[in-house]
Swiss-Prot record:
Active site, renumbered: E140
Class of the enzyme per the UniProt entry, highest EC level: hydrolase
Protein known as: Acidic mammalian chitinase
Annotated function: Degrades chitin and chitotriose. May participate in the defense against nematodes, fungi and other pathogens. Plays a role in T-helper cell type 2 (Th2) immune response. Contributes to the response to IL-13 and inflammation in response to IL-13. Stimulates chemokine production by pulmonary epithelial cells. Protects lung epithelial cells against apoptosis and promotes phosphorylation of AKT1. Its function in the inflammatory response and in protecting cells against apoptosis is inhibited by allosamidin, suggesting that the function of this protein depends on carbohydrate binding.
Organism from which the protein derives: Rattus norvegicus
Protein family per UniProt: Belongs to the glycosyl hydrolase 18 family. Chitinase class II subfamily.
Reaction(s) catalysed (UniProt annotation): Random endo-hydrolysis of N-acetyl-beta-D-glucosaminide (1->4)-beta-linkages in chitin and chitodextrins
PROSITE patterns for this protein: CHIT_BIND_II, GH18_1, GH18_2
Region annotated Disordered, chain positions: 395-421
Record-level GO cellular component terms: cytoplasm; extracellular region; extracellular space
Composition bias type Gly residues, residue spans: 410-421
E.C. numbers: 3.2.1.14
Main location (coarse class): cytoplasm
Gene from which this protein is expressed: Chia
Chitin-binding type-2 domain sequence ranges: 424-473
């Protein structure tokens, strides 16, 4: 009995020391800095207490070597990795690739042993130089989108060689081993064409399953971005387009549940309804919904942009079979996730013993708390609490929850925040949007519900009316 008590106490002690049994992996995108006004987001805006792992997206590749993409990546790398000074348990990774990167550079790199070795050597040097703890491979996708069938096996070879090189480097440098993870497909045909699941799972630390973009305007009818379950009426391949099916497919085909990280989107897909009175799931559509004022991409709204849509009178509904919400107003329709659906999915994740959650992306959450009246980072915080992520010993940043107030026209010292007075000043009577400031090319007016906010581009950039964005002069 004494031994049993001792063992039980030891297990409890280990659980306390190790923290949560789950991981919360949060992507940050290096183009979020270019969003206007309150949407602009940089590493300093990240709360380092929310996630167990942060991933910087994206790096590129030239001549089979990892490279920066943005002009200020090196500066942002430092700010990103400095977040570990405020959370000693935080791990940071650098993601390479992404959808827009395509497949050709990966195909060339994996095609020969020499090319792979060139890549691996450059990765180790790069990660150590800039202070990252690992590499996230975002090849979308091996064996698809122009990638030849042999890349399925060569991807396994690459991951195996990366893992072995990381292990050897850790011994030689007497430093913790660099992690190797991958963001992988949710579409069954892409999974089958791209991944040797049992073999890959031996070498990857985490498998980040991109369980979103399961429906969009490309379908020609409304659908949820990331439904937990299928609709009762869905048959054939449509019955595969849900989080539950995809995650269990990976598990049933050889991936350990504890390495599988479930994708959670902090954005929604928008549609134009063909008939504004037909508003349910599966309603005919005629294309993408309009771009949001911050993310500026047709068919796509950040969570905080969705909150504005809801606040402006959209009808909200709950898709009970799929455990996710949708909303509509006029001919605009959005399928998305909210606090309730994140909570439901987190409980399902725990019941199925998956390794944790991955969010795309932390810069799409309501990080200022200005849009949704749910506090700062409401979606990410929901997962943090649901997965029992420890925050002891971590120092959160003090983000402003409202724009810094300065009289319209008086200017400010830079940054992305301005201010104004309700119903007065430049924006009185004007439509919501961004407007140039006549005597200051670095500044712009941001009008929201008649309220005037003067905001500034980053130093060296000017407000460009052709794109309503900050651009090089």
């Amino acid at each position: 009995m004494a031994k049993l008590i001792l063992v039980t106490g030891l297990v409890l002690l280990l659980n306390v020391q190790l923290g949560s049994a789950y991981n919360l992996v949060c992507y940050f995108t290096n183009w979020a800095q270019y969003r206007p006004g309150l949407g602009s987001f940089k590493p300093d805006d990240i709360n380092p207490c929310l996630c167990t792992h942060l991933i910087y997206a994206f790096a590129g590749m030239q001549n089979n070597q990892i490279t920066t993409i943005e002009w200020n990546d090196v500066t942002l790398y430092k700010a990103f990795n400095d977040l570990k000074n405020r959370n000693s348990k935080l791990k940071t990774l650098l993601a390479i690739g992404g959808w827009n990167f395509g497949t050709a550079p990966f195909t060339t790199m994996v095609s020969t042993s020499q090319n792979r070795q060139t890549f691996i050597t450059s990765v180790i040097k790069f990660l150590r130089q800039y202070g990252f703890d690992g590499l996230d491979l975002d090849w979308e996708y091996p064996g698809s989108r122009g990638s030849p069938p042999q890349d399925k096996h060569l991807f396994t070879v690459l991951v195996k060689e990366l893992r072995e090189a990381f292990e050897q480097e850790a011994i030689e440098s007497n430093r913790p081993r660099l992690m190797v993870t991958a963001a992988v497909a949710a579409g069954i045909s892409n999974i089958q064409a791209g991944y040797e699941i049992p073999e890959l799972s031996q070498y990857l630390d985490f498998i980040h399953v991109m369980t979103y973009d399961l429906h969009g305007s490309w379908d020609g009818y409304t659908g949820e971005n990331s439904p937990l379950y299928k609709l009762p009426t869905e048959t054939g391949s449509n019955a595969y387009l849900n989080v539950d099916y995809v995650m269990n497919y990976w598990k049933d085909n050889g991936a350990p549940a504890e390495k599988l990280i479930v994708g959670f989107p902090e954005y929604g897909h928008t549609y134009i309804l063909s008939n504004p009175s037909d508003t349910g799931i599966g309603a005919p559509t005629s294309g993408n919904g309009p771009a949001g004022p911050y993310t500026r991409q047709a068919g796509f709204w950040a969570y905080y942009e969705i909150c504005t849509f809801l606040r402006n009178g959209a009808t909200q509904d709950w898709d009970a079979p799929q455990e996710v919400p949708y909303a509509y107003k006029g001919n605009e329709w959005v399928g998305y996730d909210n606090i309730k659906s994140f909570s439901v999915k987190a409980q399902w994740l725990k019941q199925n013993n998956f390794g944790g959650a991955m969010i795309w992306a932390i810069d799409l959450d309501d990080f200022t708390g200005s849009f949704c009246d749910q506090g700062k980072f409401p979606l990410t915080s929901t997962l943090n609490k649901a997965l029992d992520i420890p925050t002891a010993g971590c120092t959160a940043p003090d983000l402003p929850s409202e724009p810094v107030t300065t009289p319209p026209g008086s200017g400010s010292g830079g940054g992305s925040s301005g201010g104004g007075s309700e119903g007065s000043g430049f924006c009185a009577g004007k439509a919501d949007g961004l407007y140039p400031v006549a005597d200051d090319r670095n500044a712009f007016w941001h009008c929201i519900n008649g309220i005037t906010y003067q905001q500034h581009c980053q130093a060296g950039l000017v407000f460009d009316t052709s794109c309503n964005c900050c651009n090089w002069p």
